[in-house]
């Protein structure tokens, strides 16, 4: 359900097609940017299959289709310590890594890449990082990302977000329940159930 596994006993995988949806997100962001400029990616982590699939598909689509768009940075939220140490070295600051906040890391990335025109956020947490930066630093990149919650809907209505990939959690749960029942009854299942 939602995230694949290499466990051999899985009878069905129920999820959004993360590759196709990230490809569409790349197309939408490129369109909003006029098919040129610098992009930063904000990924929820560097390890989960969902994040890797979304990142790889997004990057592949941008690199293969939009020669005038450059991906200048990919921020993985689970690698914040690496970014903190990079900041300390590059900025020659006396701060310790433990004293640097995630907000300061995001500020640093936008200062390092002042010409960023677009941002891709792989989930709602990553989206919040970009939206918070917009509020703090008065930057206004084009933004396309995943997941809908109250904050992202409000930002979309206000024109702060240019596109959202919205999954179907009800459909995922329903399809997973049906697939589980079919597995319990020794009935066949599709190997992959795309919930849109």
Predicted regions and their residues:
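Short beta-strand->loop
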Residues: 15, 40-50, 75-78
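Hydrophobic alpha-helical
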Residues: 58, 78-155
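Short, solvent-exposed amphipathic alpha-helices that sit
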Residues: 21-25, 49-71, 82-87, 101, ...
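Extracellular/periplasmic ligand-binding modules, especially the Venus flytrap/periplasmic-binding
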Residues: 122-131, 157, 167-185
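Hinge/cleft segment of the Venus flytrap/periplasmic-binding protein
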Residues: 50, 61-72, 171-196
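Soluble non-cytosolic domains of exported or imported proteins
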Residues: 16-20, 49-53, 96-100, 121-125, ...
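Flexible loop/hinge segments that line or gate small-molecule binding clefts
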Residues: 1-20, 31, 38, 44, ...
């Amino acid at each position: 359900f939602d995230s694949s596994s290499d466990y051999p006993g899985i009878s069905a995988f129920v999820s959004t097609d993360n590759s196709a949806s990230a490809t569409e997100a790349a197309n939408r962001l490129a369109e909003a940017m006029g098919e040129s400029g610098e992009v930063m990616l904000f990924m929820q982590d560097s390890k989960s299959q969902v994040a890797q699939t979304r990142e790889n598909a997004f990057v592949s689509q941008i690199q293969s289709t939009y020669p005038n768009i450059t991906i200048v940075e990919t921020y993985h939220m689970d690698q914040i310590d690496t970014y903190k140490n990079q900041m300390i070295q590059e900025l020659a600051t006396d701060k310790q890594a433990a004293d640097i906040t995630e907000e300061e890391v995001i500020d640093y990335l936008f200062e390092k890449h002042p010409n960023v025109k677009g941002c891709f956020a792989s989930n709602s947490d990553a989206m919040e990082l970009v939206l918070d930066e917009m509020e703090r630093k008065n930057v206004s990149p084009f933004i396309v990302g995943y997941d809908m919650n109250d904050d992202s809907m409000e930002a979309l209505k206000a024109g702060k977000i240019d596109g959202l990939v919205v999954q179907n959690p009800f459909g995922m749960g329903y399809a997973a329940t049906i697939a589980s029942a079919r597995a319990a009854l020794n009935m066949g299942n599709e190997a992959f159930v795309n919930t849109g």
